[in-house]
């Protein structure tokens, strides 16, 4: 049985383009069956993260808007 692990990237306090740049760097080191959990409070991330994932062929499997931040689970 395969288990899926999450790599958490907390970019709260960072503004565009830093959340996407940190995501891109994390993706370079991802292993099979790992997902990335990106936490951000950058208002532009609602557009930037899905756009980046779409361009690169990555899938956002979950997207939540919390009170003070957004959360994305990304499958690469």
Residue ranges and their predicted role:
Residues 6, 35-37, 69-71:
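Intrinsic-disorder/low-complexity, polar/charged segments enriched in Ser/Thr/Lys/Arg/Asp/Glu/Gln
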Residues 10, 39, 63-64:
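Solvent-exposed beta-strand sheet faces enriched in polar/charged residues
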Residues 1-30:
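An N-terminal amphipathic alpha-helical segment
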Residues 22-58:
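Amphipathic, hydrophobic secondary-structure cores in small proteins
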Residues 50-76:
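C-terminal structural segments of small proteins and small subunits
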Residues 10, 43-44, 72:
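Intrinsically disordered, low-complexity regions of eukaryotic proteins
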């Amino acid at each position: 049985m395969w288990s899926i692990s999450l790599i958490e990237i907390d970019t709260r306090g960072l503004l565009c383009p830093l959340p996407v740049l940190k995501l891109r760097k994390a993706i370079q080191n991802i292993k099979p069956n790992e997902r990335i959990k990106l936490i951000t409070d950058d208002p532009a991330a609602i557009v930037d993260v899905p756009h980046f994932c779409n361009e690169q062929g990555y899938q956002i499997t979950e997207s939540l808007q919390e009170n003070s931040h957004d959360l994305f689970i990304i499958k690469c």
